[in-house]
Every structure is written in structure tokens, then in C-alpha cells.
């Protein structure tokens, strides 16, 4: 990797990969950079709010299922708008999915991390850079109020539930040989 690509790789590692590895207990809090320790606070808050709202469960047994479910949910999440709050929801969702895979002992957590990394690189990073990059994300994480966190969590949940409901309906139609 060279120049600009290395900078982008480092941004994604700082914001996304470090938190996911911390969340799934691959690294301790002491191994997080000072920057990662700061953003961990807002991401942990998002995760706690999400826990109070709903239990998210997954049915993931293959690389393709991970890619399909992950891409479906996050594409819906960012369909009409990218903002820092939704990016927080994306990171927490990615961490939750990776933890599910690790806890299920199916050794697919690295697929989640790679899929999340690639989605962020290709779909979110240009927006992030044009909106202040790491510094602005840190500012957002330090100054978010409870209302904006709850609003973003509710929006994320509506997108997640819509996607999962749609997938369930499609599966039901397939099972009944209607499509």
C-alpha cells in the first residue's frame, strides 16, 4: 500500500477494525489507541441503547450468508443518507455480527470484518473524508447527545427490521413455491 491508500486503510483500522476486535475480545481496552479509546465510548453507548431496544439474532453459517445479510442491512441503512450517527450504528452492527460468529464457533468473524472493511472503504470512506475524517468523527463521538443517539438507533432498527422482514417474506414465498 502506498500514500493515500495507506492513509485510508489506517482510518478504517482506527475506526472500524479496532473496535470490532475489542468488541469480540481479540484485543483488550489497553491495546486500543487513545483515539480508539475515545470513540469506544460513543460506540459502547450505541451498543447499550441497542441492547435496550431489541435483541438482534443472526442465522449465519456460511460466507455467502454473511455477505448477503450484512450488505442488505447496511445498504438499506445508508440508502438515503450517510451521517456519523449511522456510521456508529454500522460499526456496532458489524461488531455484533462478528461477535455472533465468534460465539457460534463457526470461524466466520474474519469474513464479517473483511466485509465491513470493504463496505466502509468503498461506500463510506469518501463521505467520511469529505466530512472531516477521523477528527470530525471524534468530535461527533465526544459531543453527541442522547437524543441523536436514540434517534439513530431507532432508525437503524427500523432498517434492520425492514430488511429481515423482507428476507423472511421472500423465504416464505420460496418455501411455498410461489417465487
UniProtKB/Swiss-Prot annotation:
A motif (BH1) lies at residues 76-95. Keywords: Apoptosis, Early protein, Host endoplasmic reticulum, Host mitochondrion, Host-virus interaction, Inhibition of host apoptosis by viral BCL2-like protein, Late protein, Modulation of host cell apoptosis by virus. SMART domains: BCL (SM00337). The keyword DNA-binding does not apply. Pfam families: Bcl-2. A motif (BH2) lies at residues 126-141. It is found in: Host mitochondrion; Host endoplasmic reticulum. Induction: Expressed in the early phase of the viral replicative cycle. Expressed in the late phase of the viral replicative cycle. GO terms for molecular function: BH domain binding. Disulfide bonds: none annotated. GO terms for cellular component: host cell endoplasmic reticulum; host cell mitochondrion. One of its GO terms (biological process) is regulation of apoptotic process. Its main location: host cell. It comes from the Viruses. Suppresses apoptosis in host cell to promote the viral replication. Has the ability to potentially bind to all the members of the proapoptotic Bcl-2 family. Inhibits autophagy by interacting with host Beclin 1 (BECN1). Belongs to the Bcl-2 family. PANTHER family: BCL-2 BCL-2 HOMOLOGY REGION 1-3 DOMAIN-CONTAINING PROTEIN, BCL-2 RELATED. This is Apoptosis regulator Bcl-2 homolog.
Amino acid at each position: 500500500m502506498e500514500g493515500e491508500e495507506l492513509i485510508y486503510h489506517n482510518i478504517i483500522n482506527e475506526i472500524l477494525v479496532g473496535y470490532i476486535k475489542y468488541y469480540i475480545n481479540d484485543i483488550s481496552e489497553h491495546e486500543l489507541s487513545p483515539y480508539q479509546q475515545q470513540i469506544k465510548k460513543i460506540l459502547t453507548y450505541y451498543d447499550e441503547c441497542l441492547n435496550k431496544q431489541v435483541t438482534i439474532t443472526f442465522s449465519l453459517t456460511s460466507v455467502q450468508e454473511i455477505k448477503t445479510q450484512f450488505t442488505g442491512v447496511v445498504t438499506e441503512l445508508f440508502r438515503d443518507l450517510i451521517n456519523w450517527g449511522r456510521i456508529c450504528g454500522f460499526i456496532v452492527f458489524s461488531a455484533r455480527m462478528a461477535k455472533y460468529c465468534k460465539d457460534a464457533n463457526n470461524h466466520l468473524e474474519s469474513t464479517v470484518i473483511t466485509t465491513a472493511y470493504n463496505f466502509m472503504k468503498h461506500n463510506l470512506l469518501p463521505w467520511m473524508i469529505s466530512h472531516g475524517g477521523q477528527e470530525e468523527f471524534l468530535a461527533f463521538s465526544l459531543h453527541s447527545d442522547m437524543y441523536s443517539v436514540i434517534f439513530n438507533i431507532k432508525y437503524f432498527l427500523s432498517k434492520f427490521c425492514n430488511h429481515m422482514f423482507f428476507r423472511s417474506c421472500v423465504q416464505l414465498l420460496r418455501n411455498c413455491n410461489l417465487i
